[in-house]
UniProtKB/Swiss-Prot annotation:
Swiss-Prot/TrEMBL catalytic activity: sn-glycerol 3-phosphate + an acyl-CoA = a 1-acyl-sn-glycero-3-phosphate + CoA
Protein name: Glycerol-3-phosphate acyltransferase
Record's keyword terms, sorted: Acyltransferase, Cell inner membrane, Cell membrane, Lipid biosynthesis, Lipid metabolism, Membrane, Phospholipid biosynthesis, Phospholipid metabolism, Transferase
GO molecular function list: glycerol-3-phosphate O-acyltransferase activity
Alphabetized CDD domains for the sequence: LPLAT_DHAPAT-like
Species name: Escherichia fergusonii (strain ATCC 35469 / DSM 13698 / CCUG 18766 / IAM 14443 / JCM 21226 / LMG 7866 / NBRC 102419 / NCTC 12128 / CDC 0568-73)
Record comment regarding domains: The HXXXXD motif is essential for acyltransferase activity and may constitute the binding site for the phosphate moiety of the glycerol-3-phosphate.
Amino acid sequence: MSGWPRIYYKLLNLPLSILVKSKSIPADPAPELGLDTSRPIMYVLPYNSKADLLTLRAQCLAHDLPDPLDPLEIDGTLLPRYVFIHGGPRVFTYYTPKEESIKLFHDYLDLHRSNPNLDVQMVPVSVMFGRSPGREKGEVNPPLRMLNGVQKFFAVLWLGRDSFVRFSPSVSLRHMADEHGTDKTIAQKLARVARMHFARQRLAAVGPRLPARQDLFNKLLASRAIAKAVEDEARSKKISHEKAQQNAVALMEEIAANFSYEMIRLTDRILGFTWNRLYQGINVHNAERVRQLAHDGHEIVYVPCHRSHMDYLLLSYVLYHQGLVPPHIAAGINLNFWPAGPIFRRLGAFFIRRTFKGNKLYSTVFREYLGELFSRGYSVEYFVEGGRSRTGRLLDPKTGTLSMTIQAMLRGGTRPITLVPIYIGYEHVMEVGTYAKELRGATKEKENMAQMLRGLSKLRNLGQGYVNFGEPIPLMTYLNQHVPEWRESIDPIEAVRPAWLTPTVNNIAADLMVRINNAGAANAMNLCCTALLASRQRSLTREQLTEQLDCYLDLLRNVPYSPDATVPSASASELIDHALQMNKFEVEKDTIGDIIILPREQAVLMTYYRNNIAHMLVLPSLMAAIVTQHRHISREALLHHVEVLYPMLKAELFLRWDRDELPDVIDALAREMARQGLITLQNDELQINPSHSRTLQLLAAGARETLQRYAITFWLLSANPAINRSSLEKESRTVAQRLSVLHGINAPEFFDKAVFSSLVLTLRDEGYISDSGDAEPAETLKVYQMLAELITSDVRLTIESATQGE
């Protein structure tokens, strides 16, 4: 480019460089989209806009991609490196230049016909200034319409810092030429497909138009389901129809979001400013699979784990910066206090009560509102655990909202609904101290303004944040496979509960929890806490801690927990340095070296972070515990031990493997442990390696408390086979509390009611407890004897003495 065009672009770039601060999606386009910079690249943009072109150019130069203003020279032919699909309007709408996109596509395809070695990568790129979806009434033109020069000027002026450049996966023109030919009709088809691609991308980024709030309420009131519920309310409470209708409207006011794009923009600025100071980085993985779902027109339901109140803001912030619409979020009614409630509502929160029981009108209004969100195409987010995890582990799922999601499908909607499990991880959770108090019996403090300000005042260095998108569950595909007759239950008017609904919802919920854990994120904090809590003194020398972290990292890298799980790329030493900056540990220096100590008062709090990744290390920890106690054991005996205990572990930690997959997983882990020198592996015999016994013992300690808990319950069951489930849970907790005091066990979840409740249910499912409440004494005793070999003699004596004299 030379002469006047260069001067023109330089002059235009001056104000743009000041006004525009765009973000690239994905953050690093070349590696994330598999672009090969050694091969020719050309860019396709939806509209003829020099502002868009220069904004794209800035991102290309920042990411070492070819400059779109530099023409491509192919076989002596110079062609522009960019193509505008549409000429775009001008100030004077009757003057529109002739589109050149089809001619340029044809020129590029023609070059491929004459040069069989040529393969140009065509990269669709959309540049967006602002993402307001607009309202259903009041605007004639669609959002993100083509802007003329004056409109574009004001868009850049007002929204230049809320802009992003979205790179899409490349299309091989060589493939197009070989598969479809190179004539002009193919060029026209290519331009038409590109137009559809950009239209879908706009919808994914902006979302459907927002309804006027009162219009939405009127539509809901007119629905037959709510009309019937209002009549029932009037009849059952002996009130007038008008009063019952007012009650329904009051419930809508309580529930419904009041989404505001301007509030999203403002909050994005505040969060961007705040999190750059609080977090050292927010790591996002597998976002492309969600962008693809949105592009393909799926109704997306985000289902994250729930660690902190920060989850609401973090996920919306991440999705917004991934070029997606922030979802409507189901938030607990406890957060509907001033000023947080109105703010959250404008950020897309709709509020849900803890229970729907005994209030038919409320459940009907909520179900119809949720169904309306789905039918309008809004993405939705809810926490399937129902509340924040106090222990750092996943809670058993609450299936009410999930059941309503499937009932929404049974209304006969056309858009496919897809559930997206999400793992959210932190190196610091601001509520962790409160969680520990609540687990010790303190009453949960009601959320209010003062509590929120206290929490904000404590925010300091939060380390890294992690948002990992798991493997989606397309509901239509799932139902087609597991409930082929599901379409017979479609009823566009009444909410139906076919016989298959409850078991199917329970299975989907369990699958979601497994997929959330599959996307787990190991980090410096949870790895260091795992190692230090494994030490009985809660302290290790720096060399010992480095060695232990190397063990964990090698296990997680060489035998990955799942394809979606993430492991730090940093070295063990770098992770320790980072963890020390979080000010959770103490360092004592002597003439030999550093000793890293987890203070007693911090130990209980740090179990939270260890529990975040307990599922990723529990199987190698269990294997290490078995080998450590037996000194040497055959592969068959090891496999038998694991297979007996695995159903309890799978139910408690939502592990991913089926029982028939265990032999291969155990073999892979055994080979890795042998490679590390932790054990020797010869003739299907596993034997402890004395020179690495400390590392193996620390690895084994990860399963220590779980085995002790199982031993308590199996001992009580074998000592009293006729004990009922309720008493078994209660007595197990009592013995666990006693054990934690006598043996200094600092983990709050050690005697958590939910953990023992889940364990007893699994024992029933596995046949250790029959439907009549009687255990199988012989089998129960065998399992206890196996567990007794894996725990220390003093712990065993405490457990067995707890039932003596009864």
